[in-house]
Design a protein with these regions (language model features):
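Short aromatic/hydrophobic "clamp" motif used to bind/position activated sugar donors
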Residues: 61
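Donor-binding/catalytic cores of nucleotide-activated saccharide
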Residues: 45, 69-180, 188-192, 196-205
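Active-site-proximal specificity loops/subdomain of glycosyltransferases
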Residues: 33-36
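C-terminal subregions of glycosyltransferases and related glycan-biosynthesis enzymes
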Residues: 191-248
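Glycine-rich, basic loop-to-helix element that forms the pyrophosphate-binding segment
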Residues: 40-56
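Active-site acidic Asp-centered loop
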Residues: 14, 64-66, 96
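A conserved acidic beta->alpha catalytic loop
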Residues: 13-22, 43-44
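Short, acidic, metal-binding catalytic loop of nucleotide-sugar glycosyltransferases
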Residues: 1-6
Length: 248
């Protein structure tokens, strides 16, 4: 497995009805010091993330959805950077990298990059005036690698059986982030186009009530914390809210 003993892989079987449990157990048996298979009743995407955080023992935490995948070369670069940070005892709360919209039947792939939004390969704080996200530079779950202890300490609990909670995964922990870094590599392939997928337009229309529930939660959270936010973080979260309102 790429990464070897440097990486702890948690496979969360969230009540799957296919061969997920069998495949997860096979990997855990073959790589007992690397892979953990976690079986639980279905609680939805958010609860699977909660379970992963609760079981994680690594320094950093990355969510990879079952539809998606990571680029091998970019993955190597990310691991190299994170390993060096840990060895040098450098404080970093979140690492941002690029993601690719991998749409079905579309040859040309759109890449979400953050050049110009913040310096590359430098640890900075939200007080840094160079942080300038534009309104088209969406930071999604696919972009971030959080420090595991930050996720545990901030008390993040994504709601069960609710779609679109990945937005809460960005929004709520981010106010606890003191140090961040951008690595300009195309790491995450975000697969779009599977029938019934939560971001499918028809599916989103059917679940607009859940989108609105998440949006109300984001607005309330922002209202309760906005006075304490550094200017750059305030601007980032406000733009994020604006994007979510447009989607809804």
């Amino acid at each position: 497995l790429l990464g070897g003993e440097l990486v702890e892989i948690l496979i969360v079987d969230d009540g799957s009805t296919d061969d997920t449990a069998k495949i997860a157990d096979a990997y855990a048996e073959k790589y007992p010091t690397i892979v953990k298979a976690i079986h639980k009743e279905n609680g939805g995407h958010g609860d699977a993330v909660n379970t992963g955080i609760a079981h994680a023992t690594g320094v950093y935490f990355k969510v990879v959805d079952s539809d998606d995948w990571l680029d091998k070369e970019a993955y190597k670069q990310v691991l190299k950077v994170l390993k060096k940070l840990v060895e040098d005892e450098k404080d970093l709360d979140v690492l941002l990298s690029n993601y690719i919209y991998d749409k079905v039947e579309r040859r040309k792939k759109r890449v979400m990059r953050y050049h110009g939004a913040l310096p590359e390969k430098r640890i900075i704080s939200w007080e840094d005036s160079r942080i300038r996200f534009n309104k088209f530079q969406y930071v999604l779950m696919h972009s971030v690698i959080y420090r595991t202890q930050l996720l545990k300490d901030c008390g993040l609990q994504l709601p069960k059986h609710t779609f679109y909670v990945d937005n809460l995964y960005i929004f709520e922990p981010m106010i606890h982030v003191k140090k961040l870094m951008y690595l300009n590599v195309d790491l995450y392939h975000y697969y779009i186009g599977r029938e019934g997928q939560s971001v499918n337009e028809k599916t989103m229309m059917k679940r607009i009530d859940q989108q609105m529930l998440v949006n109300r939660t984001l607005i309330q959270f922002f209202s309760e914390n906005r006075k304490e936010l550094p200017p750059q973080m305030y601007r980032f979260l406000f733009q994020y809210l604006d994007m979510m309102m447009c989607v809804a």
